[in-house]
Amino acid sequence: AQTAADTDQTHERTLFIVAMLKTLYLRVSELSERPNWQPAWKHFWQDSDGNQWLKVLGKGNKIRDISVPSALSPYIQRYQKYRASQSPNFGVNSALVAKNRGTGGMTSRQLRRIVQQGFDLGYEKMRAEGFTDEAKALREATTHWLRHTGASQDIATRPLKHMADDLGHASMGTTDQVYIQSDMKERARSGKSREV
């Protein structure tokens, strides 16, 4: 998505969606417009210590705040700049992920389609560069895969409670079961063939 956006600004939205889903461990529904929730730029906020947050409506209609890492800021600013160049009415009340034609935010189905197009572009690029085996993972990737990948990469460096809160898990046990125990199974599998 990064390469596509660097060469064609129409892919800025794809890059933003992919970065948000992976980095903030979002469910696709948390970026989508629903009858009871319209994700908007005003849902980004800063606390008194200067920490960045994003307010989302998650599973079970529960509102939660997700910590926004500094590394995501360039992607946010890049997409804001693009959106401002496309719409003179762009502002804090604008949809977080807007349609190219029409008004308002996007549905989960529309977001999935955009991400899939990004995966398809990545797949073709990787194949063209000779990374055929690695490219196969993108053929099977989903929006939820981005959430899982982001969380799996971060689980070793963040407290379990913080991960559970950002993931929107009601229980740390869920986070432990999905990310820690599965990591231990993988560790055991990779460790079986060690030599004495």
Q: Which residues does each PLM region occupy?
A:
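Short, basic (Lys/Arg/His-rich) helix/loop patches that form interaction surfaces
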Residues: 5-7, 112-165, 172
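DNA/chromatin major-groove-contacting recognition/catalytic segments
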Residues: 165, 177-196
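Conserved tyrosine-mediated DNA breakage-rejoining catalytic core shared by Y-recombinases
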Residues: 33-76, 84
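Conserved hydrophobic/aromatic "anchor" residues
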Residues: 78-79, 150
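C-terminal catalytic core of Y-nucleophile DNA break-rejoin enzymes
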Residues: 58-78, 92-117
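A short, basic/aromatic helix-end/turn motif that makes direct DNA contacts
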Residues: 33-44, 154-157, 164-171, 178-181
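Basic, Lys/Arg- and aromatic-enriched nucleic-acid-binding interface segment
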Residues: 1-28
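Short, cationic motifs built from Arg/Lys/His that form the positively charged side of catalytic pockets
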Residues: 13, 26-29, 59, 64, ...
